[in-house]
Structures are given as structure tokens and as C-alpha cells.
Amino acid sequence: MENSEVVLQKGCVKVPNFDFNALSQVIDTVNGESKIPNPYLNNYILESSFQLMDAQMHPIFHSVWNEFEKNFNPHGRRSNIVLFFSFCSGGRSNAHADVEDVRIFGLYGKTIYIINGNEYIVTQGDLLHIPKNTVHRGIGISPR
């Protein structure tokens, strides 16, 4: 289901109750690769954004994962849920383009995505579709 338009749908994803306690449970059980995907200041590591791969392995994400696979991956291509999180306001990604379509769902907090000079605000339950090869940057307005 390929779409070449950036689309933001407000409140359309039924997300689980999620907070930083739930995040620690996911980190503790998923065994997914984790990293700081952007440059950071050595003395302020906790102000960075963090990335956790394969979050779909945790039961809290099974219903979202199954729904996304049914709606957006009809050919069963390799896919995953990647969590991006930050403990402080202002964490951001580098501007980048992905080689595949990206669907971002708001789980916790507020994030602004800058895409083609436009700002898209994503909060809990929102779904943002970013077509492949589209340059975008996420900026956390609150911890997320």
C-alpha cells in the first residue's frame, strides 16, 4: 500500500497505556539493539534521543503490530517497530530520508516532524505516514 503523500491522521491508532515504567519493561525483555542515533554531548547523555529496535516482540505492542501488518504490509515484507524515546524536551533526530515508507505512531509525549518545510505534530494515538526517500526530522517537544 504505497502512498507518495505525507499524511497525518489524528487519534486513529489504539495505543497501549505507556509510560517510562512500561518502556523499562520493554527494554528489559525485548533484547533489541539499542543506540543513540544522533550526535550527543558526552556530559549530557540523558538529553539524547535513543532508539530501540524490534519493540514488536513485546506483548504490549502485539495488537498494534498485528493491525499495522494487516493494513500496511500485505506482502509480508520484513518490518519492525522501532521505538525512539527521550527523557528530556528538545531531543531530535538528524534530518534524514528512509529507503522505505515510514509510519510513525504517537505513543507518549509530543513530537514535531518537519517535512518539506511543514510541521506535523504527533501525540498519543496519531499516525504519520512519511513516504520513502522523503527528508524529515523529529523534534521532541516533551519527553517521549
Where are these regions (language model features)?
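An N-terminal JmjN-like helical accessory module and its immediate linker preceding a catalytic domain
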Residues: M1-V26
